[in-house]
Amino acid sequence: MGLPWYRVHTVVLNDPGRLIAVHIMHTALVSGWAGSMALYELAVFDPSDPILDPMWRQGMFVIPFMTRLGIKDSWGGWSITGETGSNPGIWSYEGVAGAHIVFSGLCFLAAIWHWVYWDLDVFCDSRTGKPSLDLPKIFGIHLFLSGAACFGFGAFHVTGLYGPGIWVSDPYGLTGKIQPVNPAWGAEGFDPFVPGGIASHHIAAGILGILAGLFHLSVRPPQRLYKGLRMGNIETVLSSSIAAVFFAAFIVAGTMWYGSATTPIELFGPTRYQWDQGYFQQEIDRRVRAGLAENLSLSEAWSKIPEKLAFYDYIGNNPAKGGLFRAGAMDNGDGIAVGWLGHPIFKDKNGHELFVRRMPTFFETFPVVLVDEEGIVKADVPFRRAESKYSVEQVGVTVEFYGGELDGVSFGDPAIVKKYARRAQLGEIFELDRATLKSDGVFRSSPRGWFTFGHATFALLFFFGHIWHGARTLFRDVFAGIDPDLDAQVEFGAFQKLGDPTTKRQVV
């Protein structure tokens, strides 16, 4: 019988051999994409400036995931940390990409083999000779194997016992490096920003998975539960698998968008909440005050601020500033950052310090307003000059830079002061090269934004898929008129559909 496009997957419904084949082919496609994408990113990635042009500014998507798992060197002689001439051995970025492509090829061949040799003895019950799969037993096997892999990752790879460790950094994303991590078994292990929780949770979840797998291998489900949850129906497996996947997708969308130890800002860029809360601005202010307390001059205190920290405190690195349909890397938007101009301090003609009010995340334009330390408006760039009372010219605002390339330089020309006031709305001021990439000046999101949007969207779609297939398997007799206890293999390509005269409906 002919199948409409949206029902073509039913051809593998009662065909375990070809069900395996299509899943292996899917793995081949996923692995092949990952390896190919890694090679493409490596071809276009510029590792020369890890401070002002890091991977996330360049739109790298798979390189950050390799890096957080312990890969940091290239066969090209560069390292993500800025070192040169290192010898990474086989596990370089290119080595990982090549391994994925080789694995993809092997999966491709295995998929073809399983498609051709689909009617294997292992799929038949030796006592009856009828096709049958022991799905609870298969569940136990998969649970045991995934538990073992989970435990191995936490106990060996993350801890450095047999592996490199993972990417660990400080709260401000300045000192990140690959290092072994000790498991955190106390309450701190539940803090999403504590790397030790990654090790301890993988170890604990792995042990639980191994024990649960052994349980399901050794204990049969009660008949009432087996029938009630349709454990003999492969669509039950599909439904529960989709549930696991959409749940995981929602979780990682959250850990990516809100930030966690698994999504370091050095690899994926800052989160929008760090801009909203003035996170880096407060740390910079704390460091400057500490410098002044040590009798440093204002210029010396600002000059000690790491350029990396200042760059985080710039709205162009906020992943929520890029529209969902603005394709391309951050560098294609506001340009490639070249250097920090320094911190501008504005003063009125009486010498009182003024502060530019920063632009909130969801504004494209925002009035230029300068306030005093009590938050009272003292100067602005007016929309209507005729009614202006607080214009830069009237208030006599000047600006002087501390730290950065313009350290010690001051400006009194109102046009220049207004230019830097507008730029100070966006955080620390950087020189940006828009010519090299023909950047259009419109902000882009970082890989953090793309990952979150993609996973949240697919999680929602998969949630509906879980409901759909769960309902189909639980109410198969209602929807298709097929006895739920029917376990006979039916004609190839004609499965369990309403109005299909070839599908057997009753057990007897």
UniProtKB/Swiss-Prot annotation:
SUPFAM superfamilies, A to Z: Photosystem II antenna protein-like
InterPro entries: PS_antenna-like (IPR000932), PS_II_antenna-like_sf (IPR036001), PSII_PsbB (IPR017486)
Membrane topology: Multi-pass membrane protein
Matches recorded under Pfam families: PSII (PF00421)
The keyword Plastid appears for this protein: yes
Family per record: Belongs to the PsbB/PsbC family. PsbB subfamily.
Name used for this protein in its record: Photosystem II CP47 reaction center protein
Species of the source: Cryptomeria japonica
